[in-house]
């Protein structure tokens, strides 16, 4: 069937460590030089002779834009008293507007940090969880975590963000959204064609300017790869090599 020929056969080859590319007869007939060059470029990437290695990673990168909010130095009572809800909601909206998409956990920590509250307990967290729905954000649940955004525009897996300042605001694995991690993986695979999951973790760690690949970060990368497989973006071979679908 058409599905066997165009989908299942190709996925089977990729799962068995084949590097697969399509050459359509009509494209070759109309422009054979272009198609031959495309195949040569693919072979150069596979053999490591491509001088443009890393271009996909660079192209998919953009700067992380932090919200412009004033820094306060308050205590936990500022949040739990209920007297400052309007100010807290305003900060939540400003942060999501500038830094979307953003995980629920990071949104809470990020907002509290602008209030000078770096350590907090369940009472403060529950109050923040009660205020977030008042903002009217759009949200999507991925890998067990809610990710918020201000706009209705669907989030794509095309760009990942890198912080340019000396002090990074993102510290934990879910601070880097699955949208960004999948975009980074796609870019890496455009450069390298196929990679093992541990190689992807190393590439991601370097691209995001993290000090080292922790066990939690490696597990998170693997979860994002699995999500990419479910979305039809990646194919995992029997030897655990990942390639673009």
Predicted regions: what they are:
Residues 1-42:
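Basic, amphipathic alpha-helical patches used to engage nucleic acids or provide basic targeting signals
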Residues 37-59:
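Non-catalytic C-terminal interaction segments of nucleic acid-processing enzymes
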Residues 53-245:
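C-terminal non-catalytic scaffold/interaction domains in large multidomain proteins
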Residues 27, 32, 46, 210-215:
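Basic, low-complexity terminal or inter-domain segments flanking catalytic cores
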